[in-house]
Amino acid sequence: MDSINQKILLDLPDGIELFIKREDKLHPIISGNKFRKLKYNIQEAKRLGHTTLLTFGGAFSNHILAVAGAGAEFGFKTIGIIRGEELENKIAENPTLAKAQELGMQFHFVSRTAYRDKEEKMFVNHLHELFGNFYMIPEGGTNELAIKGCEEILTDTDKVYFTHVACAVGTGGTISGLINSSGQNQQIIGFSSLKGAFLSDVIRNFVVKTNWNINDSYHFGGYGKVNDELIQFLN
Protein backbone atom coordinates (compact mmCIF):
# COMPACT_ATOMS: atom_id res chain seq x y z
CA MET A 1 0.00 0.00 0.00
CA ASP A 2 1.39 3.40 -0.98
CA SER A 3 0.52 6.82 0.39
CA ILE A 4 0.05 10.01 -1.60
CA ASN A 5 2.76 12.57 -2.36
CA GLN A 6 1.08 15.97 -2.01
CA LYS A 7 2.87 19.02 -3.39
CA ILE A 8 3.21 21.98 -1.01
CA LEU A 9 2.74 25.31 -2.76
CA LEU A 10 5.39 27.59 -1.27
CA ASP A 11 7.54 30.34 -2.72
CA LEU A 12 10.78 28.40 -3.05
CA PRO A 13 13.99 29.03 -5.02
CA ASP A 14 13.92 27.98 -8.66
CA GLY A 15 14.04 24.26 -9.22
CA ILE A 16 13.06 23.27 -5.66
CA GLU A 17 9.80 21.42 -5.07
CA LEU A 18 8.47 20.35 -1.69
CA PHE A 19 6.12 17.42 -1.19
CA ILE A 20 4.59 15.85 1.89
CA LYS A 21 4.01 12.11 1.91
CA ARG A 22 0.51 11.58 3.30
CA GLU A 23 1.13 8.46 5.35
CA ASP A 24 -1.80 9.57 7.51
CA LYS A 25 -4.10 8.45 4.70
CA LEU A 26 -3.14 4.77 5.07
CA HIS A 27 -5.66 4.07 7.84
CA PRO A 28 -8.05 6.21 9.94
CA ILE A 29 -6.51 5.10 13.27
CA ILE A 30 -3.39 3.02 12.54
CA SER A 31 -2.02 5.87 10.48
CA GLY A 32 1.33 7.12 9.30
CA ASN A 33 4.48 5.40 10.45
CA LYS A 34 2.47 3.46 13.04
CA PHE A 35 0.84 1.47 10.24
CA ARG A 36 4.29 0.65 8.86
CA LYS A 37 5.77 -0.22 12.26
CA LEU A 38 2.93 -2.51 13.27
CA LYS A 39 2.45 -4.35 9.96
CA TYR A 40 5.08 -7.06 10.44
CA ASN A 41 4.74 -7.11 14.22
CA ILE A 42 1.08 -8.03 13.83
CA GLN A 43 2.01 -10.77 11.37
CA GLU A 44 4.64 -12.09 13.78
CA ALA A 45 2.25 -12.04 16.73
CA LYS A 46 -0.23 -14.09 14.70
CA ARG A 47 2.46 -16.49 13.54
CA LEU A 48 3.51 -17.13 17.14
CA GLY A 49 -0.09 -17.72 18.21
CA HIS A 50 -0.41 -14.70 20.49
CA THR A 51 -3.81 -13.26 21.31
CA THR A 52 -2.64 -10.23 23.32
CA LEU A 53 -0.49 -7.24 22.38
CA LEU A 54 1.22 -5.28 25.16
CA THR A 55 3.03 -2.00 24.68
CA PHE A 56 4.16 1.17 26.43
CA GLY A 57 3.61 4.91 26.10
CA GLY A 58 2.68 8.24 27.59
CA ALA A 59 -0.84 9.50 28.05
CA PHE A 60 -0.89 11.24 24.66
CA SER A 61 0.96 8.53 22.73
CA ASN A 62 -0.08 8.04 19.10
CA HIS A 63 1.56 4.63 19.37
CA ILE A 64 -0.77 3.59 22.21
CA LEU A 65 -3.79 4.55 20.11
CA ALA A 66 -2.45 2.79 17.02
CA VAL A 67 -1.87 -0.48 18.90
CA ALA A 68 -5.39 -0.26 20.32
CA GLY A 69 -6.71 0.23 16.79
CA ALA A 70 -4.66 -2.66 15.45
CA GLY A 71 -5.95 -4.91 18.20
CA ALA A 72 -9.54 -4.01 17.42
CA GLU A 73 -9.06 -4.55 13.69
CA PHE A 74 -7.07 -7.79 13.82
CA GLY A 75 -8.63 -9.50 16.82
CA PHE A 76 -6.06 -8.99 19.58
CA LYS A 77 -6.60 -8.05 23.18
CA THR A 78 -4.45 -4.98 23.91
CA ILE A 79 -2.75 -3.74 27.06
CA GLY A 80 -1.12 -0.34 27.43
CA ILE A 81 1.46 0.32 30.13
CA ILE A 82 1.06 4.06 30.70
CA ARG A 83 3.78 6.34 32.06
CA GLY A 84 2.49 8.30 35.06
CA GLU A 85 -0.44 7.60 37.36
CA GLU A 86 -2.16 10.99 37.35
CA LEU A 87 -4.80 10.00 34.77
CA GLU A 88 -5.61 6.56 36.17
CA ASN A 89 -9.03 7.71 37.33
CA LYS A 90 -9.45 10.42 34.69
CA ILE A 91 -9.24 8.50 31.44
CA ALA A 92 -12.27 10.29 30.00
CA GLU A 93 -10.40 13.59 30.27
CA ASN A 94 -7.70 12.41 27.89
CA PRO A 95 -8.85 11.99 24.26
CA THR A 96 -6.05 9.58 23.34
CA LEU A 97 -6.64 7.22 26.24
CA ALA A 98 -10.41 7.52 25.96
CA LYS A 99 -10.33 6.46 22.30
CA ALA A 100 -7.87 3.64 23.00
CA GLN A 101 -10.14 2.38 25.78
CA GLU A 102 -13.11 2.60 23.42
CA LEU A 103 -11.16 0.35 21.05
CA GLY A 104 -10.73 -2.22 23.82
CA MET A 105 -7.35 -1.42 25.34
CA GLN A 106 -6.78 -2.24 29.00
CA PHE A 107 -4.50 0.17 30.87
CA HIS A 108 -1.91 -0.38 33.58
CA PHE A 109 -0.60 2.89 34.98
CA VAL A 110 2.86 2.96 36.55
CA SER A 111 4.96 5.67 38.15
CA ARG A 112 7.53 7.46 36.04
CA THR A 113 10.26 5.89 38.14
CA ALA A 114 8.95 2.37 37.53
CA TYR A 115 8.43 3.15 33.84
CA ARG A 116 12.16 3.73 33.37
CA ASP A 117 12.66 0.01 34.09
CA LYS A 118 10.12 -1.12 31.51
CA GLU A 119 12.67 -3.11 29.49
CA GLU A 120 14.28 -4.78 32.51
CA LYS A 121 13.70 -8.52 32.85
CA MET A 122 12.24 -8.19 36.35
CA PHE A 123 9.71 -5.61 35.18
CA VAL A 124 8.67 -7.69 32.17
CA ASN A 125 8.36 -10.82 34.33
CA HIS A 126 6.04 -8.88 36.63
CA LEU A 127 3.90 -7.94 33.64
CA HIS A 128 3.65 -11.62 32.70
CA GLU A 129 2.51 -12.38 36.25
CA LEU A 130 -0.20 -9.75 35.89
CA PHE A 131 -1.35 -10.38 32.33
CA GLY A 132 -0.13 -13.83 31.30
CA ASN A 133 1.28 -14.43 27.83
CA PHE A 134 1.55 -11.52 25.41
CA TYR A 135 3.43 -10.20 22.38
CA MET A 136 5.42 -7.18 23.55
CA ILE A 137 5.90 -4.16 21.30
CA PRO A 138 8.41 -1.57 22.53
CA GLU A 139 7.58 2.06 23.28
CA GLY A 140 7.18 3.90 20.00
CA GLY A 141 7.06 0.57 18.18
CA THR A 142 10.69 0.49 17.05
CA ASN A 143 12.24 -2.93 16.52
CA GLU A 144 13.63 -4.87 13.56
CA LEU A 145 10.17 -5.73 12.24
CA ALA A 146 9.05 -2.11 12.53
CA ILE A 147 12.04 -0.98 10.51
CA LYS A 148 11.23 -3.60 7.88
CA GLY A 149 7.81 -2.00 7.55
CA CYS A 150 9.25 1.51 7.37
CA GLU A 151 11.51 0.39 4.54
CA GLU A 152 8.33 0.25 2.44
CA ILE A 153 7.52 3.96 2.83
CA LEU A 154 9.59 5.04 -0.18
CA THR A 155 8.37 3.77 -3.53
CA ASP A 156 10.73 3.07 -6.42
CA THR A 157 9.62 6.38 -7.94
CA ASP A 158 10.31 8.23 -4.68
CA LYS A 159 13.86 6.89 -4.61
CA VAL A 160 14.55 8.38 -8.04
CA TYR A 161 12.55 11.62 -7.99
CA PHE A 162 13.40 13.07 -4.58
CA THR A 163 16.92 14.18 -3.67
CA HIS A 164 16.20 14.78 0.03
CA VAL A 165 13.80 13.04 2.41
CA ALA A 166 13.05 14.57 5.82
CA CYS A 167 11.11 13.19 8.76
CA ALA A 168 10.55 13.70 12.47
CA VAL A 169 12.51 11.36 14.72
CA GLY A 170 11.31 9.94 18.03
CA THR A 171 12.66 6.44 18.64
CA GLY A 172 14.58 6.18 15.37
CA GLY A 173 12.61 3.42 13.66
CA THR A 174 11.06 5.36 10.82
CA ILE A 175 14.24 7.11 9.75
CA SER A 176 16.16 3.82 9.96
CA GLY A 177 13.73 2.28 7.49
CA LEU A 178 14.01 5.30 5.21
CA ILE A 179 17.80 5.14 5.29
CA ASN A 180 17.89 1.42 4.53
CA SER A 181 15.61 1.78 1.52
CA SER A 182 16.88 5.15 0.27
CA GLY A 183 18.13 5.67 -3.26
CA GLN A 184 21.80 5.89 -4.12
CA ASN A 185 21.81 9.68 -4.41
CA GLN A 186 19.33 10.56 -1.66
CA GLN A 187 20.04 12.36 1.60
CA ILE A 188 17.88 11.48 4.62
CA ILE A 189 17.40 14.21 7.24
CA GLY A 190 15.86 13.59 10.65
CA PHE A 191 14.48 16.30 12.93
CA SER A 192 14.67 15.01 16.47
CA SER A 193 11.93 15.48 19.05
CA LEU A 194 14.59 15.16 21.75
CA LYS A 195 17.99 16.71 22.36
CA GLY A 196 21.07 14.53 22.52
CA ALA A 197 23.35 12.36 20.43
CA PHE A 198 21.88 9.08 21.69
CA LEU A 199 19.45 8.84 18.76
CA SER A 200 22.29 8.66 16.27
CA ASP A 201 23.73 5.74 18.24
CA VAL A 202 20.35 3.99 18.17
CA ILE A 203 20.01 4.48 14.41
CA ARG A 204 23.50 3.13 13.76
CA ASN A 205 22.36 -0.17 15.27
CA PHE A 206 19.91 -0.57 12.37
CA VAL A 207 21.65 0.97 9.35
CA VAL A 208 24.92 0.73 7.44
CA LYS A 209 24.47 3.61 5.01
CA THR A 210 25.90 7.03 5.86
CA ASN A 211 23.63 9.27 3.77
CA TRP A 212 21.81 10.71 6.78
CA ASN A 213 22.03 13.21 9.61
CA ILE A 214 20.01 14.22 12.67
CA ASN A 215 19.12 17.84 13.45
CA ASP A 216 18.16 18.44 17.09
CA SER A 217 17.85 22.24 16.85
CA TYR A 218 14.05 22.14 16.84
CA HIS A 219 13.11 19.91 19.77
CA PHE A 220 11.67 22.86 21.75
CA GLY A 221 12.27 21.06 25.03
CA GLY A 222 11.05 17.59 24.02
CA TYR A 223 7.70 15.84 23.78
CA GLY A 224 4.70 17.94 24.73
CA LYS A 225 6.73 21.13 25.21
CA VAL A 226 6.05 24.47 23.51
CA ASN A 227 7.54 27.94 23.58
CA ASP A 228 6.76 31.30 21.99
CA GLU A 229 8.87 30.55 18.91
CA LEU A 230 6.94 27.36 18.18
CA ILE A 231 3.55 29.00 18.79
CA GLN A 232 4.48 31.85 16.44
CA PHE A 233 5.50 29.37 13.75
CA LEU A 234 2.25 27.42 14.10
CA ASN A 235 0.20 30.59 13.80
What residue ranges belong to the model's regions?
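PLP-dependent amino-acid enzyme catalytic core
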Residues: 1-235
